[in-house]
A protein has these predicted regions:
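A short, N-terminal "cap"/entry segment at the start of jelly-roll beta-barrel domains
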Residues: 1-105
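Short Gly/Pro-enriched turn/cap motifs at secondary-structure boundaries
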Residues: 66-67, 112-114
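Short, conserved beta-strand element in jelly-roll/cupin
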Residues: 79-82, 115-131
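A contiguous catalytic/ligand-binding core that recognizes phosphate-bearing ligands
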Residues: 100-111, 118
Length: 131
């Protein structure tokens, strides 16, 4: 079951004062049909560096894709099911294709989910373990 993640976003009112503009469950969730139990929840995206804080638009309101824009970032939660639930029936190629990353799988790795991109990924395990 996919976690419902509360996302609180601040912005600015007409006087430039910081205010809360969003407070609710993150709406941008993708459950991977080709990999049962794998889910991506995007919380925010920046288009480049330095990031702009102009406007109050939802920066995560767009289709889920693997890589951020050039010099940009994605704040994402990835939920991995236990290997026993998906490893045998997984279709990694379909999964990567569905998020615009058919070029990313690492053909030299025995793990179908390993991939290479021009990004730096920070991973924090909140629950369970990753092998």
């Amino acid at each position: 079951m996919v976690w419902k993640v509360r996302r609180v976003v601040t912005g600015h009112d007409q006087d430039g004062k910081s205010v809360f503009i969003m407070d609710g469950y993150a709406p941008n969730v993708l459950e991977m049909a080709s990999m049962p139990g794998l889910a991506l929840t995007d919380l925010w995206e920046t288009k480049g560096a330095p990031a702009s804080n102009d406007g109050n638009a939802d920066a995560a309101a767009r289709p889920v894709h693997l890589e951020p824009p050039k010099n940009g970032t994605i704040l994402r939660i990835v939920e991995f099911p236990p290997d026993s639930q998906w490893r045998q029936s997984a279709d990694a190629r379909k999964a990567f294709d569905s998020i615009g990353a058919g070029h990313a799988p690492d053909k030299h790795s025995a793990d179908p989910m390993m991939h290479k991109t021009s990004t730096v990924d920070y991973i924090i395990v909140l629950k369970g373990e990753i092998w």
